[in-house]
């Protein structure tokens, strides 16, 4: 993200590979807030297969346009409701947030690589120089 110092507005490219990878990876759940200018994706509450009284919500915040581990933050919230529909919500620390983050980074790298390969001006640095 670029910071425009005059306005305090952050510029985030929606064509960014991490943004696109996140949207693709979160397509299994409804999204409640997708703000590309603010660099955030928030899912709606959704229930895991085996639990009707527990729901989770995923937040993905983009801190950079670059494909880097410190350029993205994934947070997961869990809501548990009792039989009287009283609910408690808390942020959870689990391996799931790290797994989602890694999946986004891997998918973003794959997207970037495929775009480079299809770019006619791209020269593969691994290719041997045949000029003598």
Model-inferred region functions:
Residues 1-132:
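Ser/Thr-rich, low-complexity intrinsically disordered terminal regions
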């Amino acid at each position: 993200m670029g910071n425009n110092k005059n306005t305090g507005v952050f510029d985030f490219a929606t064509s960014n590979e991490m943004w696109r990878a996140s949207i693709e990876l979160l397509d299994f759940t409804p999204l409640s807030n997708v703000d590309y200018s603010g660099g955030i994706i928030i899912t709606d509450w959704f229930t895991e297969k085996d639990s009707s009284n527990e729901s989770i919500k995923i937040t993905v915040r983009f801190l950079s346009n670059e494909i880097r581990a410190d350029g993205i933050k994934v947070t997961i919230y869990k809501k548990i409701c009792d039989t009287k529909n009283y609910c408690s919500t808390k942020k959870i620390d689990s391996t799931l947030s790290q797994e989602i983050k890694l999946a986004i980074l891997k998918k973003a790298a794959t997207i970037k690589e495929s775009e480079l390969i299809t770019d006619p001006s791209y020269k593969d640095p691994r290719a041997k120089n045949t000029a003598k």
